[in-house]
Curated annotation (Swiss-Prot):
SUPFAM superfamilies per the UniProt record, alphabetical: Ribosomal protein L6 (SSF56053)
Family under the similarity heading: Belongs to the universal ribosomal protein uL6 family.
Originating species: Streptomyces avermitilis (strain ATCC 31267 / DSM 46492 / JCM 5070 / NBRC 14893 / NCIMB 12804 / NRRL 8165 / MA-4680)
InterPro entries linked to this entry: Ribosomal_uL6-like, Ribosomal_uL6-like_a/b-dom_sf, Ribosomal_uL6_a/b-dom, Ribosomal_uL6_bac-type, Ribosomal_uL6_CS
A Pfam entry, by short name: Ribosomal_L6
Record key words, sorted: Ribonucleoprotein, Ribosomal protein, RNA-binding, rRNA-binding
A GO term from the CC aspect: cytosolic large ribosomal subunit
NCBIfam families, per database record: L6_bact
Protein's UniProt keywords contain Transmembrane helix: no
Biological process terms in GO annotation: cytoplasmic translation
Origin superkingdom: Bacteria
Family matches, as Gene3D superfamilies: Ribosomal protein L6, alpha-beta domain
Protein name: Large ribosomal subunit protein uL6
Subunit organization: Part of the 50S ribosomal subunit.
Length: 179
C-alpha cells in the first residue's frame, strides 16, 4: 500500500465531511471545500470520525492516485480549520506593494504599476511596503496566486531584486569580471 494513502484521516471536532458518491465535501469554521475523487479510489467514513482511503489493486496508476487522494482530502480538512498562508517579500530599490481594497498594487521597476485582483476565497494582507501574505482555505489556489505574484518580477540572481517567498534563498551569481 501507499505509505501516505494507508494513513487514516482524523476529522477534528467542528468539521463536517459529506461523501456523496465520488464527491467529498468538507465544511468547517473557515468555509467549505469539495473535491471529486478519481475513479478507482474509494473513500469511506469509519467510526470515531476517521476517513479511510482505499484502492482496488496495486496498479501503478492506482498507487499514485491513492496517496494523492488521501493528501487532497487531508489538505481540505486542514484548510477549513486552520487555513493556508504564503508569505512573500519584495526586495529592490523602489519596489513596494500597496493594498487597494481587496487588491494589491505593485511597483516593481516597470513604467507602470501592476494591480493583482484577489480571486474568490483569497485574501491579501500587507504587513509592510515590502512584505505581504496570501491567505485562503484552498492550498492549491493559495500557492497558485502566490506563484503568479512571484512571476511578476522573479528574483534576479545578480542583485537579488524581485518578489520572493519568505525564507527563500536566492543563489547569487558573480557579475562579469571587470578589467
Amino acid at each position: 500500500m501507499s505509505r501516505i494513502g494507508k494513513l487514516p484521516i482524523t476529522v477534528p471536532a467542528g468539521v463536517d465531511v459529506t461523501i456523496d458518491g465520488r464527491t467529498v465535501q468538507v465544511k468547517g469554521p473557515k468555509g467549505s471545500l469539495s473535491h471529486t475523487i478519481a475513479a478507482p479510489i474509494e473513500i469511506a467514513k469509519g467510526e470515531d470520525g476517521v476517513l479511510n482511503v482505499t484502492r482496488p489493486n496495486d496498479e501503478r496508476q492506482n498507487k499514485a492516485l491513492h496517496g494523492l487522494s488521501r493528501t487532497l482530502v487531508a489538505n481540505m480538512i486542514t484548510g477549513v480549520t486552520q487555513g493556508y498562508v504564503k508569505k512573500l517579500e519584495i526586495s529592490g530599490v523602489g519596489y513596494r506593494v500597496l493594498a487597494k481594497g481587496s487588491n494589491l498594487e505593485f511597483s516593481l521597476g516597470y513604467s507602470h504599476s501592476i494591480t493583482v485582483e484577489a480571486p474568490e476565497g483569497i485574501t491579501f494582507k500587507v504587513e509592510a511596503p515590502t512584505r505581504f501574505s496570501v491567505e485562503g482555505i484552498d492550498k492549491q489556489k493559495v500557492g497558485e496566486v502566490a506563484a503568479n505574484i512571484r512571476k511578476l518580477r522573479k528574483p534576479d540572481p545578480y542583485k537579488a531584486k524581485g518578489v520572493k517567498y519568505e525564507g527563500e534563498v536566492i543563489r547569487r551569481k558573480v557579475g562579469k569580471a571587470g578589467k
